[in-house]
Design a protein with these regions (language model features):
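Active-site acidic-Proline motif in GNAT/NAT acetyltransferases
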Residues: 79, 92-98, 127-128
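Conserved acetyl-CoA-binding loop-helix of GNAT-fold acetyltransferases
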Residues: 91, 97-110, 138
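A short helix-loop-beta-strand connector motif used in the catalytic cores of GNAT acetyltransferases and
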Residues: 46-63, 162
Length: 176
């Protein structure tokens, strides 16, 4: 098993989560991993202060996967009415490609269904990341046809090229 423990984030984890997310989304040159977007977006994906703001909100959680005491994966889940937004899915680049992202996504969906009563999961993916969109489609997500501008004002990085877009995907919860 790739992780030993799944749990929600504590305030004391904010720095480790920010480091993991930035390592996964915007790694340094020479670091492998298939989910990074360094060629599309520059700057940090998140900051400690942004993680702290997320943790201060109600109906939102960051779930982490630990190997020993090290945070090696995370995902953010935020309730919005009858659905939940899922984002900031990150896996340490060394562990990518072994199923941990799929496991974290499934756990996020279960958490949203069980704790928030979510009927649908929604996420935004950089539209030019065809391999990442294909991953989510294999997990049961569907394209909504909704495409928005990259959220430059959100403090999640600066597009390297004009016109960067985000495609909105959704998945219905499997309530049984």
């Amino acid at each position: 098993m790739l992780i030993d423990t799944l749990r929600t984030v504590h305030n004391s984890d904010a720095e480790a989560v920010a480091q993991l997310v930035n390592k996964a989304y915007r790694p340094e040159a020479g670091v492998s991993g298939w989910t990074h977007e360094s060629d599309l977006v520059s700057g940090s994906r998140t900051r400690i202060s942004q993680i702290e703001v997320i943790l201060s909100k109600q109906d939102t959680v960051i779930i982490v996967g630990l190997k020993g005491s090290e945070i090696v994966s995370c995902v953010h889940v935020e309730k919005d009415g009858s659905h939940s937004h899922i984002g900031m899915l990150a896996v340490n680049p060394v562990l990518q490609g072994a199923g941990l992202g799929k496991q974290m996504l499934a756990h996020a969906e279960s958490y949203a269904s069980e704790n928030f009563g979510s009927e649908k999961f929604i996420m935004g993916v950089v539209s030019s990341r065809a391999e990442l969109i294909a991953f989510y489609l294999r997990q049961g997500y569907q394209k909504t046809g909704l495409i928005t501008d990259y959220p430059e004002s959100a403090g999640v990085g600066i597009p390297r090229h004009a016109g960067l877009k985000v495609e909105i995907l959704e998945k219905r919860a499997n309530h049984t």
